[in-house]
Amino acid sequence: MNFNKKKKNLLIPIAVIFCVLYIIFSVQPMGHEIHFTPEWTEDISHIQENSNNTKKIPFKLSQNIGYFTPDGKIVSAITFPFKSTISEKWYAAFGASGTKTDFFFADGTLAGTINEAGFPFFDQDRIFVMQPGGTAFVKCDSEGKCEWNYEHYSPITAFSSSKNGTAAGYADGTVISFLPDGKIDQKFAPGGSNCDVILGVAISENGNRIACVSGQDQQRFIVAEKNGGHSKVIFHEYLENSISRQTLVKFNNNSDYVYYNGKDFLGIVNTKKSTSKKIPIKGKISQIEFSDDNELVFVLSKDEEKYTVTILESFIYPMASFSFEGECSFIKTYENSIFIGRNTKISKISISKK
């Protein structure tokens, strides 16, 4: 097989998509134009040797996890039969029993063993284990040993962590946040709905703010802030149409905007001004990523068999979107590029201003 010819053919549809994006951008009333340029497309089966010092970006596509480099080398692709978790630092594949789990560094060397029963979850350089029964979780250290744990009487329905804290939402409508050492920092129940389940939660990078989608039948979106030993609600609004599944909530890096997936829309709240905006997006939002300069927001959503990437400028203004069909997908940002995974292929698109 002529791989170079195949690679060129794969870039053609992506180039067409971004030519359309260029036309859309060029009619925007902006002082600059943002250009998207296709760089490469690789199949995850094309494994190449790579220096350990090179940046490795994690991916998950269907039943495959692994790492690739910004210059287009697929470093590893591991097929897992049941469940897996991956971050820039570690990866692990595990079965249904979940009695103990070996986990590995990105280069494939053993990092440690998690002896806690349950399903491990890696979030950047943080390790958690969701324990059997669904009401308890464990925070582990970098070797997989238990640092602290917490058990509630009601099942965990939403979870989030950041550098400075962890937040969990529960089926009884309670939201609890924890300091990095496991001490409870905030605990409150938003209420206001006929069914008070927490369907989505996020904690800000500094650990001071928590946002959640709360309840059904008079569903609300709420942002709370630490105020002494209490939690102060700094924003709330009722949602006209309730969502009935777990949903994504995410702060931007500076915690001045928070995003959430409502029923066929993306909700955006400016936490400094206590203002909100809704952008129509059908289906389920699976990822929200930010460019390194924080000027662009990329939103990946899926409606039936169609994926859509929606691009926002200045945190709230829709600029463009494009769609494609696929069985699985992901997006990642790094420096001045966005990486898009689709089925068994990964593509790099560079971003520039001219």
Located regions from the model:
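N-terminal "mature head" segments of proteins
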Residues: 1-114, 140
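Glycine- and small hydrophobic-enriched segments that form the cores of compact globular domains
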Residues: 130, 139-213
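Extracytoplasmic/luminal low-complexity segments enriched in Pro/Gly and acidic/polar residues
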Residues: 195-197, 201-354
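A short beta-strand motif characteristic of beta-propeller blades
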Residues: 33-44, 71-80, 105-115, 143-151, ...
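Terminal alpha-helical anchor/extension segments at protein ends
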Residues: 14, 19-20, 172, 195, ...
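Repeated scaffold domains used in trafficking and secretory/extracellular systems
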Residues: 43-54, 78-90, 113-126, 151-163, ...
